[in-house]
């Protein structure tokens, strides 16, 4: 059997290698227009940042090494330009000479992948404008940054690739601005409130992020000098285009293949509508494991799984690819984000009666030296308690939380299946009650009515407007809120009416839940706990008592302070010193400001 595979990165090389292991008699040929095969595409940003020192580390196998290990014939520098399915031939052009020839096949596998989308704007051909797809791209970017001592860069696209590139450019000492046309970062990957938290974190880390912004033109003569956007002109010496990807399927448009928006449609055995033609990887439309509906999920991990399944199918094994969950994880400066399954919005659109929770927890024993945090958002079906999705933020191993959810969703788990799961525990690794299980407990409490809460999304939308904020922290920390010492609550609380709407807020949510439990037993009927508490939400109380007069506001601003427009009486100031010293006049100004009520 002669099997021709077009494309030699993840899905292509996986399919070919598995084919030869399953059937040594098969004649397997891989054709690719690139000079490299089987390279670590997901590792390219880390080469740019210098975390990976040598380009060769990105090459899993050279063509010669791969051929020797697997018995697969590899032809590089060969670009497929047409498919003649009726003749069982692919027309291939030599990249260097332009010569064309026909390759016959018994079975054809299309693993042509995807490339960064090219923006329909002026200036994409300027020096200093790059995309990120191959090791050559990464090498060119790194060399350009170092040779030109780049100070400012703009990244177009706030998906996984764009954010990874931004982090690694920052590691090279470059000031980075990320822009995206969508209203949030990581669109269709995480829900809005999770994206808001991550965006704020990036800003704190020194990466500027502008969402809801379109690139209109790339400025410059010979080399890029800036990007004209709907938000204004952004000066830069380097521009990375990472605004999504599109399948490399243009040459297949007149082949008779059934396609949708450039993706190849396949069944569960990875077969196309054409006889003896199969496809896998970033160029195919598969299905979502939860909804069963079509989903394009271009990930290296999925491409490998699809390639393995396809190889088994081609060698006679009765096997089907179950689809994707869109599982992914991304590393930002001092923050990791992981996700799998459906977002809240996607679950609602799929017809589920959705219930969610946002739960901050420790990621290991709080007293252990490198203890960090998880913020876990669980998405489930209210009636069946079926787990539908998870999103996790944290400064540690968020992938372990995501992987638990992946296995649960794969097995059709309901929340109760996790209650007594015997997860590994030791202080250096986890908490006595696993963080994932803690989040499940909280969501179950919410479903059965033991916890009445307000989600961060609801809080951000203004649902707390008519609520009195009650600070339940260890010490008072919310300006303008009513402070309640939890340890002293043994009955009714003076100043809090039992019919009053009370929003209970603490550091992470536990103390708020404890107070709600007590207050409900004392007859308080309208208490609500803010999910995520102060750890996740920016909690502010509108002060209606200490309104600053216009005259006083003018006086304070004259001292060099800026008014915080989100409050009625708060001003912000900054002291810039020279070698750590301030003048006598500056000292008097600071002292006067400190005395302000």
Regions found by a protein language model. Name each.
Residues 110-172, 208, 261, 266-268, ...:
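Glycine-rich dinucleotide-binding loop and its adjacent helix/turn
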